[in-house]
Every structure is written in structure tokens, then in C-alpha cells.
Amino acid sequence: MTMRVTFLGTSGAVPTTQRNTSSIFVNRDGDYLLFDCGEGTQRQMMRYGTGFAIDHLFVTHLHGDHVLGIPGLLQTWDFNERERAIAIHTPAGTRGNIKQLIQANGTTPSFPVRINEVSAGDVVLDRSEYEIRAIETAHRCASVGYVLDEDDRKGKFDREKAEEEFGIPPGPKYSKLHRGEAVEHEGETIQPEAVVGPARPGRRFVYTGDTLPTESVIEASEDADLLVHDATFAEDRKERAKATAHSTAREAADVARQAGASTLALTHISTRYAASADELVDEARDAFDGEVVLAEDGMERRVEFPDADEY
């Protein structure tokens, strides 16, 4: 089961020659999900080969650098004769704004556009193996972040124990036991828990959008495998970050550290650091012992299982 995250736009409010405005594409085992859609997102999708087969767009807030790509993307789908519905998930109270944004294009899409208002704590998308929840963030307007949480996986099957202790040869009985079914072998009933370990956690991906550092994000990011956090400024601009309801790279790292995240990706990088964002990375690494990466447009990250070393 793959989970790949492609950064389509990693700049702050203004794009640069190297960074587009905010957008992240997630491929979760063939489910294609888009988080935010800044101006030019559809070109980034073409450039980095993600494809356009998304059915769900998750909006963190309505600032232009996160939504101005929506009309163009809808228009392209229309030109390509899309028929499937698209669901746009947006913070509570912003449905009308999304409608106005779409109508400003002067055309009505020929396919269904479903606008779903969400609040912190809502399960926005519920799938058989994962769910996406909205989480509380702190910005200058109605805003949410999103958490993709996978269900627990089956425990690890102990082949050595099955064969050596119970004498069960490799074959169909292994599959049954791993599915949680008891099997009969040489007159003995073998229960699955005898050879299958405890359930193993799935993966957790967190995207904050624009936010101050908050306790709600720390709680939602507990043991996250990948936390993508606002890191607009360096620490010497901390007051500016606070005034504009953003985070510094060190503050993002503090969130990751307190949450016990594995990897922190810094995004929403101010144009102030267009030449080099090394100080953001350095400050984050000073505060967080896990992996720190500076998100770049076109960067792809594979989100591994917490126990990937066991495979």
C-alpha cells in the first residue's frame, strides 16, 4: 500500500521562480487527493506528472494563495469532458466564497461540484482503510488542517513459529490464520493469536495549512509519519509570524518534537528566503531530532510504515 506525497507548491503568499503557491498531491494506493489549490496548481500537476484524476479537494482556508487555482482546474476538467463529481471540502462558513470563486470564471462546470463545509473534528472522508479528519488550526480567517489516518494493520505473521512450533507447512492455512481464522492441524485447533502478533499502526499524514503553533496540531500530529507544517519565517521574524498567524521553522519543529513525529516537512516558505532557506532548516534541526526536510516544488516523499524496517 503506497502513500506518496508530491509537493506542488511550497511558497508563502507570493510565488517565486522556484516555488509555486500552496498545493499538495497525495497518492494513497491509487486514491488521488489534493490539499489546497493555489494559482497555477494545474500546471504543476502537469509538470510533475501527478495526473488529474482527483475526486476530493481539501481546502485549508480561503486566502488566494491556497484557492486561486480552483477555477482554472475546473475549467480544464470541463474542457476534458469530465463527468465525475468533484468534492471540495472547505472550512465552515466558506461555501459561498467557493461558489463565488467558481462563478467568477463566467462558466458553470458541466460536472457536479459538491461543496462540503467542515469543522475541526469532522471525519471528512471515510474509506475502508483510512479516514481524513479536519483539525483545528489558528490563522487569520476560518481555517482547518487535515489528518490522513490509516486503520491499524494486521499483526505480523510468525512463519517460524507456525512451522517449527506447530508444524504447519506454508500454504493456505497461513492465510487463514493471518485473516484471524482458527485452523485445524493434526487434530489440534490453532488460534490465530498464537502465530499473529498484535495489530500494527497504519500511517499518519498531517497537513496544517497556514497556522500559528497550536496544541490542537500537536495532539493531531501524535506519532505522525509525515507532518507538513507552516514554516513561513526564521526565528528572527517570530513577531512577524505571530502578527500574521504563521509559524517559524523552529516553532514547527517544536510541534513535531512534542508530537513525536518521525518526519517534519517545512512549507509555505516566505519569499524572504528565495535565495536560500538553509537557516530555516538549521533552526528546525536544532529543535527536533527527527528528520527535517525543506519542501521543494516537485519533491516526492514516500510515507513509510512506522515498522518499515521489519519488511
Swiss-Prot record:
It catalyses: Endonucleolytic cleavage of RNA, removing extra 3' nucleotides from tRNA precursor, generating 3' termini of tRNAs. A 3'-hydroxy group is left at the tRNA terminus and a 5'-phosphoryl group is left at the trailer molecule. Its EC number is 3.1.26.11. One of its GO terms (molecular function) is zinc ion binding. Keywords: Endonuclease, Hydrolase, Metal-binding, Nuclease, tRNA processing, Zinc. The keyword Zinc applies. Its cofactor is Zn(2+). Binds 2 Zn(2+) ions. Transmembrane segments: none annotated. Zn(2+) 1 binds at H61, H63, H139, D210. InterPro entries: Metallo-B-lactamas, RibonucZ/Hydroxyglut_hydro, RNase_Z/BN. The active site is at D65. Pfam families: Lactamase_B. The keyword Ribosomal protein does not apply. Zn(2+) 2 binds at D65, H66, D210, H268. It comes from the Archaea. Zinc phosphodiesterase, which displays some tRNA 3'-processing endonuclease activity. Probably involved in tRNA maturation, by removing a 3'-trailer from precursor tRNA. Belongs to the RNase Z family. PANTHER family: ZINC PHOSPHODIESTERASE ELAC PROTEIN 1 (PTHR46018:SF2). NCBIfam families: PRK00055.1-3, RNase_Z. Homodimer. This is Ribonuclease Z.
